[in-house]
Curated annotation (Swiss-Prot):
Pathway(s) served: Carbohydrate metabolism; D-ribose degradation; D-ribose 5-phosphate from beta-D-ribopyranose: step 2/2
Active-site annotation: 270
Gene: rbsk
Designated name of the protein: Ribokinase
Organism for this UniProt entry: Dictyostelium discoideum
Cofactor dependency: Mg(2+)
Length: 318
């Protein structure tokens, strides 16, 4: 389907606990509020892109429990194609507990549940869908074998571009194999430094602070190392984003145009990625413009509580 985005990965049922400060080990504290929301990186990214008007298909697996039933209804309400959302019996849906402090920072504990049962056959069932998409978007929350398989299938097609959100990062060799099939890599600063250190056996950078030029040089070296990368995008929170491309004339630091009052940063990275995919694929904007537009969407999300509940629709973007 023309300008179609397919997302492979995890769906979660999120429980948010709000606190004034994070508890220390062994400490019991009183929370200030509790909310539930839909989550999971793949689900979040698909929902945000769909809210902005993209045609999105999600490949994920749910449990046959109340949270799974509600999650499936949520996808349908958000106009996501659920043809490849499968349901498994006697296994709980994925879930996450998210602790958010008064500054909007968070700690997260994830239980994979049904997400851990997403398999290569599920991806094979969606082969035609993937290969006829304009973009395949993946993360690392489900089996790495499944993610690798999806990326390989996508690159068998000349049409489908691939985007990998390298989180949660680890040092599994399968990730290096994935890089052979990735066009656009998206990382945050910590993930970039971790990837750079493991790639170049550099153990001296873990505690250092890096300036923008040093981070861009890391990206440039990674693009030279992994020749399939066309672009690396680095999210820097309140400091904006970096774009580093094979075409060096596109390299830039995109700073935030306005500061906002942060309430909750949960899911903001997914909001940015889903929005970026939308603007790049559906609206066919250039890379830099897509990043700027996505940054604006994500900056709205951090002014609201929750993950998907914080995501703006297209008519809320000025």
């Amino acid at each position: 389907m023309e300008n179609n985005i397919t997302v492979v990965g995890a769906s979660n049922w999120d429980t948010f606990i709000y606190v004034d400060k994070m508890p220390r080990v062994g400490e019991t504290i009183k929370g200030t509020d509790l909310k539930v929301s839909y989550g999971g990186k793949a689900a979040n990214q698909a929902v945000q892109a769909s809210l902005l008007g993209s045609n999105c298909t999600l490949i994920t697996k749910l449990g046959d429990d109340p949270s799974g039933v509600n999650t499936l209804k949520n996808f349908k309400d958000k106009n996501i194609n659920c043809e490849f959302v499968s349901v498994v019996s006697n296994v709980p849906s994925g879930c996450a507990t998210i602790i958010v402090d008064k500054n909007g920072d968070n700690n997260i504990i994830i239980i994979g549940g049904s997400n851990d049962l997403l398999n290569e056959k599920d991806v094979d069932n969606a082969k035609s869908q993937i290969q006829n998409s304009s973009l395949l978007l993946c993360q690392l929350e489900v089996s790495l074998n499944v993610t690798l398989h999806a990326l390989k299938i996508a690159k068998e097609s000349n049409k489908c571009k691939t985007m990998l959100n390298l989180t949660p990062i680890n040092n599994d060799p399968l990730i290096l194999e994935m890089f052979k099939f990735v066009d656009i890599l998206i990382v945050n600063e910590i993930e970039l430094i971790g990837l750079y250190n493991s790639t170049f056996n550099n153990n001296n950078n873990n505690e250092k602070d890096f300036n923008i030029n040093q981070l861009m040089e890391m990206c440039d070296n990674l693009i030279k190392k992994f020749e399939n990368f066309e672009n690396i995008i680095v999210t820097l929170g309140g400091n904006g984003q970096l774009l580093v491309s094979k075409e060096n004339n596109k390299n830039c630091h995109i700073e935030l145009k306005e500061k906002v009052k942060v309430v909750d940063t949960s899911g903001a990275g997914d909001s940015f990625i889903g929005s970026f995919a939308h603007y790049l694929v559906t609206e066919n904007k250039p890379l830099k413009d897509s990043i700027e537009s996505a940054s604006k969407v994500a900056s709205i999300s951090v002014t609201r509580h929750g993950t998907q509940t914080s995501y703006p629709k297209s008519n809320e973007i000025n």
